[in-house]
C-alpha cells in the first residue's frame, strides 16, 4: 500500500482517491479505512508511504489515530484532511506528529502540493 486514506465518509474517500489520481499519482496503491480502529488493522498489513486522515470520526478520532501511529512509527508522513482546521487544531496536530493539514474543500492542486515533497 502506498497511501492509506482514513475517513468515515465513503464519498470523501472516493473524492480523495480521485484527487490523488488527478494530481498525477495514478499508479499508487490506495487503501481505505472508515475510522482509526480499522486503519490500525490495515497498518498490520504493511506500512504506507503516506497516511491521509479525517479529524472527526466515530470509534477513534483522527488525532487519537495519529497518536497511536506515532507510538510505533515516527517517520511515516501523516496528513489531516478536515473541514475543521482552526489554528489551535493545526498546532495540536503538528505538535502530535502530523506532517500537514488540508482544509475541506480542497482541490487536486492542494493534494498535489502536499504530496510532492513526500512522494518524490
Residue ranges and their predicted role:
Residues 10-31:
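Two-component/phosphorelay signaling modules centered on CheY-like receiver
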Residues 32-41, 62:
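Helix N-cap/capping motif at the beta->alpha junctions
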Residues 41, 63-74:
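Short amphipathic alpha-helix used as the core "switch/output" element in two-component signaling
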Residues 46-52:
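Active-site beta3 strand of CheY-like receiver
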Residues 54, 82:
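Active-site residues of response regulator receiver
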Residues 57:
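Receiver (REC) domain active-site loop signature in two-component systems and cognate sites
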Residues 64, 85-100:
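Alpha4 helix (beta4-alpha4-beta5 surface) of REC/receiver domains from two-component response regulators
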Residues 106-115:
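C-terminal output helix
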Amino acid at each position: 500500500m502506498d497511501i492509506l486514506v482514513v475517513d468515515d465518509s465513503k464519498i470523501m474517500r472516493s473524492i480523495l482517491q480521485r484527487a490523488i489520481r488527478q494530481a498525477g499519482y495514478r499508479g499508487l496503491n490506495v487503501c481505505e479505512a472508515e475510522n482509526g480502529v480499522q486503519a490500525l488493522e490495515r497498518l498490520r498489513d504493511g506500512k504506507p508511504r503516506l497516511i491521509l486522515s479525517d479529524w472527526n470520526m466515530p470509534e477513534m478520532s483522527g488525532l487519537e489515530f495519529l497518536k497511536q501511529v506515532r507510538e510505533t512509527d515516527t517517520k511515516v508522513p501523516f496528513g489531516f484532511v478536515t473541514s475543521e482546521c482552526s489554528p489551535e487544531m493545526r498546532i495540536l496536530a503538528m505538535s502530535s506528529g502530523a506532517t500537514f493539514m488540508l482544509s475541506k474543500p480542497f482541490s487536486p492542486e492542494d493534494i498535489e502540493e502536499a504530496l510532492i515533497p513526500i512522494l518524490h
